[in-house]
């Protein structure tokens, strides 16, 4: 289960600097899952939240994990309403995850450019257990189209997208 646009409040102190979160402008995403996974699996996932045109906006996109023939996790969230998207494709230069990415949807309703700022990469290979992860944080810009045809212009929305391959 993934929940977007969860209002955040509070503060965090890192390296002597205080960061304050305001519920009007700051949001979090909850990612919670359970189940039985295959030994060898790969998924692509991205999520982000912010304010667009003065209203809460979020998205959840992904594929590669599980059977999505009946349903997928691709959604827009705008002003408290969910908007279903068709299939999304992540276009990534896997030789360099810090190069810009693009995202396209089969229905044309999620067309974005992504400029990475940080690749939280991890790779472990102990033969029986393998993980190769690139959780990349950056800025998303482009267009998102709501169910009623309203086009939202997205500019520099901080978010993340990941490419994860596990064997365990």
For each of these PLM feature ranges, what is it?
Residues 1-168:
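Structured soluble/peripheral alpha/beta segments that form catalytic or ligand/cofactor-binding pockets
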């Amino acid at each position: 289960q993934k929940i977007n646009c969860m209002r955040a409040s509070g503060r965090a102190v890192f390296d002597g600097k205080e960061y304050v979160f305001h519920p009007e402008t700051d949001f979090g995403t909850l990612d919670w899952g359970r189940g039985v996974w295959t030994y060898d699996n790969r998924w692509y996932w991205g999520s982000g939240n912010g304010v667009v045109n003065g209203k809460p906006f979020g998205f959840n996109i992904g594929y590669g994990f599980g059977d999505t023939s009946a349903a997928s996790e691709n959604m827009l969230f705008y002003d408290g309403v969910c908007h279903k998207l068709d299939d999304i494709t992540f276009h990534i230069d896997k030789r360099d995850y810090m190069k810009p990415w693009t995202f396209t949807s089969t229905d044309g309703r999620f067309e974005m450019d992504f400029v990475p700022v940080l690749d939280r990469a991890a790779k472990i290979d102990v033969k029986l257990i393998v993980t190769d992860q690139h959780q990349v944080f950056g800025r998303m810009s482009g267009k998102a189209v709501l169910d009623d045809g309203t086009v939202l212009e997205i500019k520099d929305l901080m978010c993340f997208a990941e490419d994860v391959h596990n064997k365990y």
